[in-house]
Amino acid sequence: MPAYIHIEALSLDCDYSDYGANTHNFIDAWVAVDEQTIGCFELPSTFPVLKKGKHKVSIRPGIAVNGIGAARSYYPFCKPADYLNLELVEDSIITLNPVINYFPIGAGFNMAWKEDFESAIGLSPTFESDTSIMRVNDAQAWHSENSFYSGRIVLPPDSLDFTVATSEELTFHTELTGDGSAMLEMDYNTNDTMFVGLMYYKNYKTEKLPLVKVLPTDKEHGIPQKWKKIYINLGHIMKEENDASYFKVYFTSDLTTDYDVDAGYVYHPVNEQRYYYLDNLKVIYRPR
């Protein structure tokens, strides 16, 4: 007869000055007992463990890569929550409240770029953009103990599109050998559809590659009302284009593309201002 473990949710604990905000979207628990993986469990979950007595139980956070529910993975930038001598009792439920931490900086975690909009803005409009991005602290901005401002882009109904990109050139891609990985963490609140992608400079020209279509969050009277978080995989493109001079992350409302990013619908509000709020942006990587 098995023992049972119940996990309602995972929490993230991190130092704001080093890692930024502790927002997360951990939807799964990847569970190992005595270093052997027993499964990935969508939270909340109560699951059986065919062990009794004291055992090491490790919980790793799981995400939906690129916001795709079918693309589940554990998050490689976070340490597992370890219970070294957890007492497992047959036909009994033990409830765990795992607290997750990032790996130490320089030891499994590297911050290539971070933007929380609390000071100068590290995003710049491209030449084809019809507007820019501003830091605001209105009612829709992300507010917490350490956060008072968010980035906001507004397009009036008669405007065309915006594109903003990281002002900083990202050059860590040469370190991404083997199974090295890179990810963009992004909090957003929008009433419109937008693309997130990578632009890179190669062979004397700039290429743009959209990666993920981000759909609108909840809205009321045309104003976006709900913040969401997404994890966007950058590493595979950076490794494929390893001979590029540099990369930049970009955000755009221009949904015309030659790439089949998503077969789903494209939404634009009709006769409404289009709002795009961004916050807690992090480009993180771990080389191999």
Summary of predicted features, one role per range:
Residues 66-99:
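Structured interaction patches on ligand/partner-binding surfaces of diverse proteins
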Residues 256-282:
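Extracellular carbohydrate recognition
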Residues 33, 51-70:
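A short, solvent-exposed beta-strand micro-motif common in secreted/extracellular proteins
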Residues 132-165:
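Short carbohydrate-recognition loop motifs
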Residues 117, 170-195, 232, 281:
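Extra-cytoplasmic beta-strand recognition segments
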Residues 1-9, 287-288:
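Bacterial Sec-dependent N-terminal signal peptides
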Residues 97-133, 276-282, 287-288:
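Extracellular carbohydrate-recognition regions
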Residues 207-244, 258:
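Extracellular carbohydrate recognition and processing domains
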